[in-house]
């Protein structure tokens, strides 16, 4: 983690010294984490390691007992989620977040209408999102008729309406079939190409390893190791307590 006195890239996410206790027992023990613009970062670990708690402290769903969260030089440790969103952090929960009875187009337009745009600008942004995410052919479909993979595409497109600096994805590979997983990985790669930082937590380590530039592996409330996938997967503690000795990325 860089010095607090250094000039920060306005789109760099930093979590510094995050701590969370439950009934006096530490769940998260001083976690430091960085996501650069245009970088895909995975937060992984066994159940009970503290990764979900850490992720939710960054999202704003859980308040940290100690530590700070920054986007660039903007501190947002105690900001509610809506303020974090205005500052540039979009969050995509695991559960379906689309309006089920609205069409795909209406789902995107509902968010576009919250922005200060002319009718023409709204229409242009809508068409760009539909095209970029390959959902133009679904524009008039009600959200409840979509497959898991199609719904995920719409949700990510919706999260990008506000042009965030960073997107936080909670279990993006859960509840979708293998073909759709590859599809979503392609979309996440697109986010990287647009210069958007991506922080992902997911139980599917194998799929995460295929797309992440860097990983943070949590064991017992702390970061055991961080680095590129080929480095962290060789760590003996990670092998012993999380991935297993026979683990291979297919």
Can you say where each PLM-predicted feature lies in the sequence?
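Conserved ABC ATPase signature
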Residues: 142-146, 150
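Helix-to-loop junction immediately C-terminal to a conserved catalytic motif
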Residues: 59
């Amino acid at each position: 983690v860089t010095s607090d006195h250094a000039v920060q890239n306005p789109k760099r996410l930093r979590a510094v010294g995050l701590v969370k206790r439950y009934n006096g027992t530490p769940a998260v023990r001083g976690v430091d984490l960085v996501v650069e613009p245009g970088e895909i970062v995975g937060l992984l670990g066994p159940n009970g390691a503290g990764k979900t708690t850490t992720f939710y402290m960054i999202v704003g769903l859980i308040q940290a007992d100690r530590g700070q969260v920054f986007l660039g030089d903007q501190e947002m440790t105690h900001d509610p989620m809506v303020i974090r969103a205005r500052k540039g952090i979009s969050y995509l929960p695991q559960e379906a977040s689309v309006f089920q009875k609205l069409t795909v187009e209406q789902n995107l337009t509902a968010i576009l209408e919250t922005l200060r745009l002319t009718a023409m600008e709204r229409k242009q942004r809508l068409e760009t999102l539909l095209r970029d995410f390959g959902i133009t052919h679904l524009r008039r479909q009600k959200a409840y008729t979509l497959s898991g993979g199609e719904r995920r595409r719409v949700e990510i497109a919706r999260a990008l309406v506000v042009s965030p600096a960073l997107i936080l994805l909670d279990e993006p590979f859960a509840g979708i079939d293998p073909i759709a997983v590859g599809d979503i990985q392609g979309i996440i790669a697109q986010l990287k190409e647009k210069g958007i930082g991506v922080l992902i937590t997911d139980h599917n380590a194998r799929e995460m390893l295929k797309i992440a530039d860097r990983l943070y592996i949590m064991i017992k409330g702390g970061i055991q190791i961080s680095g590129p996938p080929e480095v962290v997967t060789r760590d003996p503690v990670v092998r012993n307590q999380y991935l297993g000795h026979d683990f291979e990325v297919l």
